[in-house]
């Protein structure tokens, strides 16, 4: 299941921080990055696993918790602080029925939205 790229300011997001991320030191910076992409954070969760799981990157319990939070908050997407493999992203999207964006995808979305020249837009593609 593939989802369209969300529009500016119209999407609410659940942010998942991670203890083993290279970037986990500054959660507020990542939250600002999410806001810069035009998403409104409605909830922040922390993943405390020491190692990523091959299927979902997150543990099954955390994925179930996110699913319950999505139902409760009606958030449009989930943003993970870490980088996912394509199969992990696909597995999460299929299980959660929501768009999943990792750190790399978030940064590319920001660049894509702010690219002004034709060359800049091509580089983001």
Predicted region positions:
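N-terminal accessory targeting/assembly segments
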Residues: 1-112
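Extended, highly charged alpha-helical segments
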Residues: 106-125
């Amino acid at each position: 299941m593939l989802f369209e790229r969300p529009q500016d300011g119209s999407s609410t997001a659940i942010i998942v921080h991670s203890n083993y991320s290279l970037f986990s030191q500054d959660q507020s910076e990542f939250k600002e990055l999410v806001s810069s992409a035009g998403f409104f954070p409605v909830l922040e969760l922390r993943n405390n696993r020491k190692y990523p799981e091959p299927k979902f990157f997150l543990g099954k319990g955390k994925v179930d918790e996110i699913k319950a939070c999505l139902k409760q908050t009606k958030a449009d997407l989930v943003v993970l602080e870490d980088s996912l493999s394509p199969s992990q992203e696909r597995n999460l999207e299929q299980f959660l029925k929501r768009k999943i964006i990792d750190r790399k995808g978030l940064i590319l979305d920001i660049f894509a939205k702010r690219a002004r020249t034709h060359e800049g837009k091509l580089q983001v593609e």
